[in-house]
């Protein structure tokens, strides 16, 4: 099929649950032909695609935003294996899975929730970035207390977090109350 050329500048779509996908690296400026809409687009998605068909070609952010890529390829952009609280409406989960750019983690990405809604993904962070966010630090501490880690080991682990390292935290913000949430993943 022929690729349709676009000549007017294109403003990136807005994503409620991933407000800065260029800043997080999930979308990059790279002119490509989108496999879904077959148009030349100035940006491409670099995050995970969960689909039966292996999709190695570029998907544009516009086809993620309008849900056409998810529909066309029976795909999601975040793994559906994470637990969604009962108070989160199904349409919110659908928006995160099918109309929001995902992100790449070390082992298993998960989308955090708060106040009956999905939280906004702000990006990977390290110890220096979470140092001034006591609510995010508390979330990390609580996560590792759940694994029965002693307090001193948790604090040592938090100090090793690096946004580009082998242990990384992923920062979110509640869209209702503004609390910062985080979880850590490591290789």
Curated annotation (Swiss-Prot):
Similarity section: Belongs to the UPF0167 family.
InterPro entries per the UniProt record, alphabetical: UPF0167 (IPR005363)
Top-rank taxon: Bacteria
Main function: Probably plays a role in host phagosome maturation arrest.
One Pfam family cited in the UniProt record for this chain: UPF0167
Gene Ontology biological-process entries: symbiont-mediated suppression of host innate immune response
Gene deletion effect: Grows normally in liquid culture, traffics into host (human and mouse) acidified compartments early after phagocytosis, suggesting it no longer arrests phagosome maturation as well as wild-type, impaired growth in mouse macrophages.
Protein name: UPF0167 protein Rv2295
The organism of origin for this protein: Mycobacterium tuberculosis (strain ATCC 25618 / H37Rv)
């Amino acid at each position: 099929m022929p690729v349709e050329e676009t000549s007017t500048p294109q403003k990136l779509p807005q994503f409620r649950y991933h407000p800065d996908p260029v800043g997080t690296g999930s979308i990059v400026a790279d002119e490509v032909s989108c496999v879904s809409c077959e148009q030349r687009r100035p940006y491409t998605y670099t995050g995970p695609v969960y689909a039966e068909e292996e999709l190695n070609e570029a998907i544009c952010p516009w086809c993620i935003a309008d849900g056409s890529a998810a529909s066309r390829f029976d795909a999601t952009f975040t793994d559906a294996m994470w637990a969604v609280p009962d108070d989160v409406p199904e349409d919110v989960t659908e928006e995160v899975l099918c109309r929001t750019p995902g992100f790449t983690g070390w082992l298993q990405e998960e989308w955090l929730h708060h106040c009956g809604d999905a939280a906004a993904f702000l990006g990977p962070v390290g110890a220096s970035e979470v140092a001034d966010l006591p609510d995010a630090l508390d979330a990390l501490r609580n996560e590792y207390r759940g694994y029965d880690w002693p307090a001193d080991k948790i604090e040592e682990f938090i100090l090793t977090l690096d946004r580009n390292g082998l242990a990384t935290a992923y920062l979110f913000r509640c869209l209702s109350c503004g609390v910062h949430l985080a979880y850590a993943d490591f290789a």
